[in-house]
Amino acid sequence: KNMITGAAQMDGAILVVSGADGPMPQTKEHILLAKQVGVPNIVVFLNKEDQVDDDELLELVELEVRDTLSSYEFPGDDIPVVPGSALLALEALTEKPAMSAGENKWVDKIFALMDAVDSYIPTPERDTAKTFLMAIEDVFSITGRGTVATGRVERGTVNCGDVVEIVGLGDTREVTVTGLEMFQKHLDESVAGDKVGVLLRGIQKDDIERGMVLAKKGTITPHTKFESQVYVLSK
């Protein structure tokens, strides 16, 4: 469920597959889940290239990955596939954190991977003009400060001091946004696309949970009847 929760908020993904072992059962499961929750673009990293002595074997793994992606309606023939070794790149960067391109072939492959991400996965247009809406992914408490709800802002903007509604399970409740934080930086405003922690006053941790939403007052109403599409994964 954690994979689904995270994937549902992604603009794109890097699929990591062992170049030595090829796609595993969980690889196909992750591709399926990415498709069902609407991840629009995928870039592939063939890890552990250093453990593969035969270039033809690595090519076969790449073909298998492309075929698997195509079978789940991703454009397997067009998706960038970058081989490399995350471990050797990490070891090199640990020794020399400020390494530049051209100094180490394994680090260069990580640069190539990120270039592929930048070129293949487009920057999405953010819907900042509509009213604020954020699906709650997780909740925790900060002693002496209040309750924090985390998630991605789906649309609109939210500012410190705004009064918003918590909608979902139970009665709709009003709360005040007293703080915003993203990547350990405090913000005055958060906009659509931000993965943010929202500090709330007027509610306890036990009264809010994953699946509920934060929204501008009066813009969202809960429903008890709806149509849905359900995918059941067999073990």
UniProtKB/Swiss-Prot annotation:
Q: Keywords of this protein's UniProt record, alphabetized?
A: Chloroplast, Elongation factor, GTP-binding, Hydrolase, Nucleotide-binding, Plastid, Protein biosynthesis
Organism superkingdom = Eukaryota
Class of this enzyme: hydrolase
Q: Which GO terms describe its biological process?
A: mitochondrial translational elongation
Question: Would I find Zinc-finger among this entry's keywords?
Answer: no
Q: Which residues form the tr-type G domain?
A: 1-125
User: Which Gene Ontology terms cover its molecular function?
Assistant: GTP binding; GTPase activity; translation elongation factor activity
Query: Gene3D superfamilies of this UniProt entry?
Result: P-loop containing nucleotide triphosphate hydrolases (3.40.50.300), Translation factors (2.40.30.10)
Q: Which reaction does it catalyse?
A: GTP + H2O = GDP + phosphate + H(+)
| Record Pfam families | GTP_EFTU (PF00009), GTP_EFTU_D2 (PF03144)
GO CC terms, sorted: chloroplast; mitochondrion
E.C. number(s) listed in UniProt: 3.6.5.3
Q: Where in the cell is it found?
A: Plastid, Chloroplast
Give the main localization category. plastid
Which residues bind GTP per the record? 47-50
The record's InterPro entries line, in alphabetical order, gives: EF-Tu_GTPase, EFTu-like_2, EFTU_2, P-loop_NTPase, T_Tr_GTP-bd_dom, Transl_B-barrel_sf
What this protein is reported to do is described as: GTP hydrolase that promotes the GTP-dependent binding of aminoacyl-tRNA to the A-site of ribosomes during protein biosynthesis.
Tell me its family.
Belongs to the TRAFAC class translation factor GTPase superfamily. Classic translation factor GTPase family. EF-Tu/EF-1A subfamily.
Q: What is this protein called?
A: Elongation factor Tu, chloroplastic
Give the species: Mantoniella squamata (Unicellular alga)
